[in-house]
Amino acid sequence: MTGAELTGFMILAAGLFAAGVFGVLARRGILFQLIALEVALSGPALAFIAAGAYHGDAEGQGMFVLTLTLAAAEVAVGLALFLRIRRAKGSDDSDAVSGLKG
């Protein structure tokens, strides 16, 4: 892999991360925020794979597996919270679960 290819992959990874963060901040539905968070986590995962391929070592693949494991745990906890909130509040709007009164 050349330096130009690495740069392209890093730009793509940064774009995925930025799109995910924008989705988390812009959407009000909890389920859409979870999906956007998964997109945001795929950015660093792609960066780990690209950096590992550029340097020719397997540490990038190990970090990718760690990122996938973290993302799977996040989805499991997030979906459980989503179902609990939807049953309790009757809505999937993130503003509905705010405990602040005012």
From Swiss-Prot:
Its main location: membrane. One of its GO terms (cellular component) is NADH dehydrogenase complex. It catalyses: a quinone + NADH + 5 H(+)(in) = a quinol + NAD(+) + 4 H(+)(out). It is an enzyme of class 7 (translocase). Keywords: Cell inner membrane, Cell membrane, Membrane, NAD, Quinone, Translocase, Transmembrane, Transmembrane helix, Transport, Ubiquinone. It is a multi-pass membrane protein. It holds the Pfam family Oxidored_q2. Its EC number is 7.1.1.-. It is found in: Cell inner membrane. GO terms for molecular function: NADH:ubiquinone reductase (non-electrogenic) activity; quinone binding. The chain crosses the membrane at residues 6-26, 30-50, 63-83. GO terms for biological process: ATP synthesis coupled electron transport. NDH-1 shuttles electrons from NADH, via FMN and iron-sulfur (Fe-S) centers, to quinones in the respiratory chain. The immediate electron acceptor for the enzyme in this species is believed to be ubiquinone. Couples the redox reaction to proton translocation (for every two electrons transferred, four hydrogen ions are translocated across the cytoplasmic membrane), and thus conserves the redox energy in a proton gradient. NDH-1 is composed of 14 different subunits. Subunits NuoA, H, J, K, L, M, N constitute the membrane sector of the complex. Belongs to the complex I subunit 4L family. HAMAP family: NDH1_NuoK. This is NADH-quinone oxidoreductase subunit K. The lineage of its organism: Bacteria, Pseudomonadati, Pseudomonadota, Alphaproteobacteria, Hyphomicrobiales. The gene is nuoK.
